[in-house]
Amino acid sequence: RFWFFIFDRFILYPLMNQLSQTFGTKFMNLGYWPTKESATDEQMRALVERQDLHSLNDVKVKYTNIFTNSDLDRPHYFLYERALKLHSHYPDLEGLRILDVGCGQGEGIKWTKKVHPRIGSIHGVDRCAAPNPDIIPGDAHHLPYRSRQIDIVLNVESSHLYADCEQFFRECSRVLRKDGYLCWTDLLYRSQVAQIREQALRAGLFEEHWEDITDNILAGIERTAARYDSLLMKAPSIVRLFSSSLRATYCAPGTHTHARISRGEKGYYAAVWRNN
């Protein structure tokens, strides 16, 4: 985990910040794609697909011939919606205060504001945050919020990098109001699943739903990895020096990280916990 942080903090994040102005690459999650088997995704699919995705592209994307603009980040939007849809008040989420822990560059915050305009507020916390008025630099183990302030803690594909997940769960329980929710998705070794669920329970979080969404993530990776592979081919030489590490980070087919998912060593899960 230490080396993951070093790579993210000093190599991957600076590269993403530099390249986002050229490529429009702001998300760092693997992506999610509804399949025929995921029939309960219809509400979420309709919500995403009716958005004018062009309006979210606040940077000029140089290589527009790779995909249409409306497809660029759709798998990433789907993953955010997949986490939020576990909440009982989805999709309105009216008046609720949301904290996105591990929010990266804040594109998920921007998306959530657009498609859920009736929320009370949304802010982010990230240890490697770029300058953004909606994001507070902070550590998931010590959230910079007072107790009982938040209705929803949103945690998308971030907790596997934490040194102490149980401490993160305790912090969620602290900042969440009574009956507030932690909406969570992440990639885990299957051998870790029982431990993670037990840690959340010990922290005072009651599990209301747990689901394996690995097939949808693999379908998402097919789309996101194809896009990023195309961008890497056209990237500056200094970026291509890190191609192997970058491809492993976004789990491109043919990498060891993708193989761990496809052969079942790792799974991808969505869960919602209620704060007691």
Walk through the language-model features, giving the residues of each:
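Class I SAM-dependent methyltransferase SAM/SAH-binding core
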Residues: 99-142
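A short acidic, Gly/Pro-enriched loop at the edge of an enzyme's catalytic core
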Residues: 141-153
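A short SAM/SAH-binding and catalytic strip from SAM-dependent methyltransferases
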Residues: 152-164
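Conserved beta-strand signature within the Rossmann-like core of class I S-adenosyl-L-methionine
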Residues: 180-186
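A short glycine-rich, Lys/Arg-flanked "PGG" loop and its adjoining helix->strand segment in the class I
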Residues: 166-178
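N-terminal auxiliary segments of SAM/dcSAM-dependent transferases
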Residues: 1-42
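Conserved alpha-helix/loop element of class I SAM-dependent methyltransferases that forms part
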Residues: 73-94
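Conserved Class I S-adenosyl-L-methionine
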Residues: 215-274
